[in-house]
UniProtKB/Swiss-Prot annotation:
Organism: Anopheles gambiae
Signal found in the keyword field: yes
Pfam families associated with the record: Ins_allergen_rp
Region forming the signal peptide: 1-19
Organism ancestry: Eukaryota, Metazoa, Ecdysozoa, Arthropoda, Hexapoda
Protein name (Swiss-Prot/TrEMBL): Protein G12
């Protein structure tokens, strides 16, 4: 289930735009994972919640607001985040282009490349937790888990990316949280909507081995 949650968290970045055909590379590994996902069903689910669920609608409005815009800018100013994006770009993954699809949709500042070198949820009650739980229920967890294990053995590019994530300087995220009022307000907003932020953080730390 943790693998499925991780794929949901990466879905926008890996499938927002199509990757150009190349020799076998990291983009092919991502395409293999995305190929397991019921994308049409997930899109229908997202649209249903956006059209009918007030909590999800309020969340979308928040993501389009000034406070989250500040969080977005602060997050992508972190050197560890810029380094990871640069790594993905050099591996042939259009990370900036994918993220800028999200930025354009939400009215956020577009990201520009620099030279600097995602779950167990509460019971379904609608709102954000309901959306996430239904999305996770659509995930072929066993197949995703098996593909993850296979990729770690067979794809040097995928293994290198995972090791890159394991070595990600996550302490910069903690420092950002402690220093940014906007980030703290965003966390409180998510918690007020019933999202167990602390648990999500623990899942990510466990998945990547962050201590």
């Amino acid at each position: 289930m943790k693998i499925a949650a991780f794929v949901v968290a990466c879905l926008v970045a890996t499938s927002a735009v199509s990757c150009a055909p190349t020799t076998r590379a990291l983009t092919d590994d991502f395409d293999d994972f995305v190929g397991l996902l019921p994308l049409n069903d997930l899109l229908d689910l997202a649209m249903r919640y956006l059209l009918t669920d007030k909590e999800v609608q309020q969340t979308l409005l928040y993501l389009q607001g000034e406070e989250f815009s500040a969080v977005w800018d602060q997050f992508f100013e972190l050197s560890a985040v810029r380094d990871l994006l640069q790594y993905l770009e050099e591996a042939g993954v259009p990370a900036y282009e994918s993220l800028n699809v999200v930025a354009d949709f939400l009215g956020l500042s577009p990201l520009k490349p620099t030279s600097v070198r995602s779950l167990s949820l509460a019971a379904r009650t609608g709102g954000l937790n309901g959306l996430l739980e239904e999305a996770l229920a659509m995930m072929p967890a066993a197949e995703l888990e098996a593909m993850f294990e296979e990729k770690m053995k067979s794809s040097t590019e995928f293994k290198a990316l995972f090791e890159k994530m394991q070595n990600f300087d996550h302490k910069q995220l903690r420092a950002l949280y402690e220093s940014s009022t906007e980030v703290q307000n965003m966390i409180h907003k998510l918690e007020s909507l019933g999202v167990d932020v602390d648990h999500i953080v623990e899942v990510l730390k466990d998945f990547f081995g962050w201590n």
